[in-house]
Amino acid sequence: LGKLKSEILMALFAGTFENRIDRKGRVSLPADFRAELPADGPRVVYIYPSPRGTALEACGRDFMQRMSDSIEQFDIFSDEEDEMTASIVAAARRITIDTEGRIVLPPELITDAEIVDAVTFVGRGGRFQIWNPSDYFNYAAEARERSKGRTMRLLPLEGRDE
């Protein structure tokens, strides 16, 4: 792990896309998202139920490793470590992206996210979410309303005072 933060190039998932699921449970991962995954090595994503609602969370291997490492910062055998491991690491499914850019959503994850015949992919920076489209539409409208008037501060670029 001896890389500096600035040397690690993480995926940046951005945008919102809706795709239909076929009879076999396959759905095309948006091309913009596929482009963010490493070109060398296995083309996989890790998908698990969101701890914050009915969406699914998804990420590449690097982000999943960061989450696992972060969970290991809790005291071993603590309630926090146990709960986070059970709800994220143990619940995650390693999903291979086929040659046509599709993933197969396991039935239990489809049920968890209340998905029927289409999904909305939502970029979240280093990870993305998979939603039932109507649930995401409602969530996004509420989030936009709550965020009105809020501001944020950008992190400074490394090595520069801003």
State what each model feature region is.
Residues 1-18, 23-26, 33-95, 99-100, ...:
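Flexible "stalk/tail and boundary" regions
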